[in-house]
Structure formats: C-alpha cells, structure tokens
C-alpha cells in the first residue's frame, strides 16, 4: 500500500450534517478496502479560484491516506458520481 494526499471540495450549500455524511462516505471508501486514514483536515468554506458549477465557494477537505489501487480507483469513481463533490484530486506521495 502507498500513501496518498487528497483533497475534495464539497458544495457549500449543504448543511453541517450532510457535509459530515459526505466526509464519512469518502473515509469509508478507503477503510472498506483495507486502507488507513492517517489525517483529515477540514479547511471549511473558502473562496474558489474560479467558478465551478455556478459556485464561487466550496467546503475544502484535505486528507492523507494509506491505500491500495482498488481504493484509489473507487475514490475517483465515487467522487465523479457524487453530486455533492464538485472537485477532487489524489496525489501519490514519494
């Protein structure tokens, strides 16, 4: 398993409970596939550099995870499907 740093941006229109549910769903993607969440930093609502899907702000979440390729692929798939996530990225640590 390798370490990855990731970030995703959640729609700012969600209430706190729904935002926490999205974060829990993403963590579950990794833990259900044998991965470990090493760190999660919720940056909160911040201005976007440019408008995304008519939003000028987003709720940023940055994380560090140790996971296999199947969890990485599932993370990408889930983030593309979930309408509450407007952007995501995952980068392999050296």
Stretches found by the model and what they are:
Residues 2-94:
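Structured, basic alpha/beta domains of bacterial-type, RNA-associated proteins
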């Amino acid at each position: 398993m390798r370490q990855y740093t990731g970030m995703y941006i959640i729609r700012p229109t969600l209430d706190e409970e729904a935002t926490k549910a999205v974060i829990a769903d993403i963590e579950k993607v990794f833990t259900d596939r044998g991965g470990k969440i090493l760190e999660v930093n919720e940056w909160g609502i911040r201005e976007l550099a440019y408008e995304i899907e008519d939003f000028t702000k987003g709720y940023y979440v940055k994380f560090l995870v140790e996971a296999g390729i199947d969890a990485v692929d599932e993370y990408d798939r889930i983030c593309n499907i979930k309408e509450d996530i407007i952007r995501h990225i995952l980068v392999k640590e050296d």
